[in-house]
Amino acid sequence: MSTKFWLVVPAAGVGARMAADRPKQYLQVGGRCIIEHTLDCFLDHPDLLGAVVCLAVDDPYWPQLAVASDPRVRRAPGGRERADSVLAGLDALQAAGAGEQDWVLVHDAARPNLAREDLQRLLAVLADDPVGGLLAVPVRDTLKRADADGRVAQTVDRSQIWQAYTPQMFRLGALSQALRGALAAGVPITDEASALEWCGQSSRLVEGRADNLKITRPEDLAWLRQAWVERDRQR
């Protein structure tokens, strides 16, 4: 059975750590912007109902992209924090006809290497879940907790530690309520699952590929370009 879904992509950040002349989602790989590659995986999916990209009000790059004229993709104003942008996206979806019980996927604009199999697994595993969940990867490396002097204070048990990735998938109404409540309470929200966690809801972890990397630093971009060169050679 198919699982219909909406998409929100917060894309108002400037990506300062990339030290580039434009936000990282507009850097090019293979002749196209990162955000175009990011959206491809979702726009190719037959169960997508529509998408909202949350952008800086004065964003000069988005209108130049072909995807900006796709009728399935709407634009919403991004906020100061990620949670503000996602809320604006949810409001835009409701204005477009989305219901409170509809599934919404939130995905990072600079995470363009999402495998279609991972997207499909997420949708299948969470289709009947009472809360929702997210793609994640079990931590593989040894973790150290540091003291104030930058010395090892403790080795952390990694057996139950996962890295949170995106997409993250929740019901529209529940996610909106959780984000609004957490923001009103001044709770730091780093991803959508943390907002649900603050509300006492436990999100399901769905294991995905480790190469679903978020492009944050120059070395991430170099890795992505090389990985796609190797991928294209094998086709």
UniProtKB/Swiss-Prot annotation:
Keywords (A to Z) from UniProt: Isoprene biosynthesis, Nucleotidyltransferase, Transferase
Short name of one Pfam family: IspD
Entry-linked SUPFAM superfamilies: Nucleotide-diphospho-sugar transferases
Catalytic activities: 2-C-methyl-D-erythritol 4-phosphate + CTP + H(+) = 4-CDP-2-C-methyl-D-erythritol + diphosphate
Superkingdom of source: Bacteria
Record site feature (Positions MEP for the nucleophilic attack), residues: R158, K214
Listed EC numbers: 2.7.7.60
HAMAP family, per the entry: IspD
PANTHER family for this protein: 2-C-METHYL-D-ERYTHRITOL 4-PHOSPHATE CYTIDYLYLTRANSFERASE, CHLOROPLASTIC (PTHR32125:SF4)
Name of the protein: 2-C-methyl-D-erythritol 4-phosphate cytidylyltransferase
Upper lineage: Bacteria, Pseudomonadati, Pseudomonadota, Gammaproteobacteria, Pseudomonadales
